[in-house]
Design a protein with these regions (language model features):
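Conserved glycine-rich cofactor-binding loop
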Residues: 7-8
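Substrate-binding pocket helix/loop in short-chain dehydrogenase/reductase
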Residues: 80-84, 88-96, 204
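Short C-terminal tail/terminal secondary-structure segment
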Residues: 81, 212, 223-224, 230-231, ...
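A short, exposed helix-loop element centered on a Lys and neighboring polar residues
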Residues: 107-108, 153
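Alpha-helical segment proximal to the catalytic Tyr-Lys
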Residues: 112, 157-158, 232
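Catalytic loop of short-chain dehydrogenase/reductase
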Residues: 123-147, 152-161, 173-174
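Short, small/polar-rich loop/turn modules that mediate ligand/substrate recognition or access, typified
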Residues: 160, 165, 234-236
Length: 249
């Protein structure tokens, strides 16, 4: 199986969850993390480019001949200052390449082999930002994740009869190492406690009814379930994992 963006945060939690269950796991990122697990296959690549995607596909095909499980976890954006009008065409394209086109290109490369074997699972990791963008500077990211959701639903119907299940998981505020760094920065800048800084972030997104951020391991558990035979009748669903942040049904 392949987990994109699998060296830290949610991706690392997913990779370690599957590896602990005995799966052969490959991860990708632009560079390995300092704590890269030696038991995981690692491919360095910039998936925001076609060349990067091609390099990963070639490496996986040479190593395993294809995939049974593809977790399109990679997602990234910047938050430039200013309003929506400051988001340039180049910025939009970069965000779309990473958050939408990388999954599209990887799916296009690996799903045909899954269809030949009549077995496969594809899970796209989205974000609740596609429902509720937290700020103007995240509009490109939110739009890309919204497009990924539409694509994921359509793709699921196209390949389900061939034995390939496609689903999506859209996390809310998950306290990864990166998110914890943001909490620490807010704590220092505002001269408040860590708990107060964490609550400040939670309030920024409209609050979390369960009273805490999510953990990467909680996302990994849902992904593991969706990749298992226990979810064999689940197709084309987008699971919001947000502690109740999104107030609508």
């Amino acid at each position: 199986m392949l987990v994109t963006g699998g060296t830290k945060g949610i991706g690392a939690a997913i990779a370690h969850r599957f590896a602990a269950s005995g799966a052969q796991v490959a991860t990708t990122a632009r560079a390995p993390s300092a704590s890269q697990d030696a038991d995981l296959m690692f491919v360095a690549a910039d998936l925001g480019t076609t060349a990067g995607v091609d390099a990963v596909v070639k490496e996986i095909e040479n190593k395993w001949g294809g995939l049974d499980i593809l977790i399109n976890n990679l997602g990234a954006t910047a938050t430039p200052p200013g309003g929506f009008e400051t988001l340039t065409d180049a910025f939009w394209q970069q965000v779309l390449d990473i958050n939408l086109m990388a999954p599209v290109r990887l799916d296009r490369a690996f799903i045909p082999g899954m269809l030949e074997r009549k077995n496969g699972v594809v899970i796209h990791i989205g974000s609740i930002a596609h429902i509720m963008p937290p700020s103007q500077s995240t509009l490109a990211y939110a739009s890309a994740k919204g497009a990924l959701r539409t694509y994921s639903k359509g793709l699921s119907r196209a390949v389900a009869a061939g034995g390939v299940r496609v689903n999506m998981v859209s996390p809310g505020f998950i306290e990864t190492s990166g998110a914890h760094g943001m909490i620490t920065e807010i704590q220092q800048n505002r001269h408040i406690s860590e708990d107060a800084a964490r609550q400040y972030v939670m309030n920024m997104i409209g609050g979390i009814p369960v009273g805490r951020p999510g953990r990467p391991e909680e996302v990994a558990e849902l992904v593991a379930f969706l990749a298992s035979d226990r979810s064999g009748y689940i197709v084309g669903v987008d699971y919001l994992l947000d502690g109740g942040t999104i107030p609508t049904v």
